[in-house]
């Protein structure tokens, strides 16, 4: 899937907010929903069903740099709010959410084990993944194999489920053939 972006129109005057942008909860989601029609109206765009809107909001005291509603792998539109930032990493990360991608996490086990079942001892650390754009580290590497699979770049035949100790030869995920993920 290829998505191309071109620089679109920029509002000559900012949209005035009657109150400070909400940082969390329903009010933050409501902000994203309400800003979209107003921005497109001012831009003179009536059909925005296949467009992505990037909004740079002023500082509001939020701990996040960007926010976007979760879409799906086949989404063709979305809204991204940037909190006083125009970082390409933040834009890419938030666009990932509009495509249906969650955060890259890792498994942390309190008993010093390298791996284990999800339990009281082994838990996910949100944003813990450090190898792709959906983590909390500014990287330019490809998406991890789980996110590639979610986007449809890898199909089920390229993923092997392993239930016991065995040797699996892995192919790079950008090759068309072979097992690319366990």
Language model segments and positions:
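Extracellular hydrolytic enzyme modules, especially secreted metalloproteases
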Residues: 51-52, 58-182
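Active-site-proximal segments of metallohydrolase catalytic domains
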Residues: 1-78
């Amino acid at each position: 899937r290829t998505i191309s972006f071109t620089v679109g129109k920029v509002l000559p005057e900012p949209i005035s907010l009657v109150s400070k942008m909400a940082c969390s909860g329903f009010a933050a989601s409501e902000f994203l929903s309400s800003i979209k029609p107003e921005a497109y109206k001012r831009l003179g765009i009536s059909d925005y069903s296949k467009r992505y809107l990037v909004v740079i909001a002023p500082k509001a005291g939020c701990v996040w740099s960007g926010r976007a509603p979760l879409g799906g792998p086949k989404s063709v539109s979305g809204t991204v709010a940037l909190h006083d930032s125009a970082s390409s990493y933040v834009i890419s990360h938030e666009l990932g959410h509009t495509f249906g991608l969650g955060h890259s996490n890792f498994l942390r086990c309190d008993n010093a084990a390298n791996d284990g079942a999800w339990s009281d001892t082994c838990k996910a650390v949100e944003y813990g993944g450090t190898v792709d754009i959906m983590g909390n580290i500014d990287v330019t590497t490809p998406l991890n194999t789980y996110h590639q699979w979610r986007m449809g770049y890898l199909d089920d035949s390229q993923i092997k489920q392993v239930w016991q100790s065995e040797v699996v030869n892995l192919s790079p995920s950008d090759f068309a053939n072979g097992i690319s993920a366990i």
